[in-house]
Amino acid sequence: LKSFDGGLSFSDTIRVSENNPSHKYRMGNIKIDYNGNPIVNYMQYLLNWTEPKQMVNRSINFGDSFLGGIEASQSAPGEPCDCCKASLVLDNDDIFLLFRNNNSNERNSYVSKSVDGGLTFNLVNDIDDYDWMVNGCPATGPLGVVYSDSLLIVRRSGATGNDEIVYNKINKVDLNYSYTRNIDP
């Protein structure tokens, strides 16, 4: 749905994901780029809830249509955590997807980057100092903002044996982090 009159009226539903009966889709997020076009992230699964993928799909015509979903998590080991919601961060044509991954029950947070407006996601990095091994779903994902030359990211981790809220400062060019701080005493 979209509105161009302050919410007085709305368009009909506009499909963002593929119309593919062999897949399920859920956990959508939306951001609006500097031109007013929507960029949407969602999870894609097979019908039996296997093979989760973090997808990003963008519009270049204010949401009238979408270019087609791109798998933004493909360069991470394992697969995305199938029950943890991701988030998007935009910086001009750069799109950052923040998500929790599942590599044989290692549930670390990752950042994936597109430098071409979401057509490809070729750079990915694990942003955890310690591996969080848990045989279950943490049900949380990282959130972030752009600040100067960095991404500031907050996330949950239980890797040290304590349930903690952690803050990272990530270089937005190469995705390496300059520091990680526990902000939950």
Summary of predicted features, one role per range:
Residues 1-185:
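Extracellular, repeat-based ectodomains that mediate carbohydrate processing or recognition
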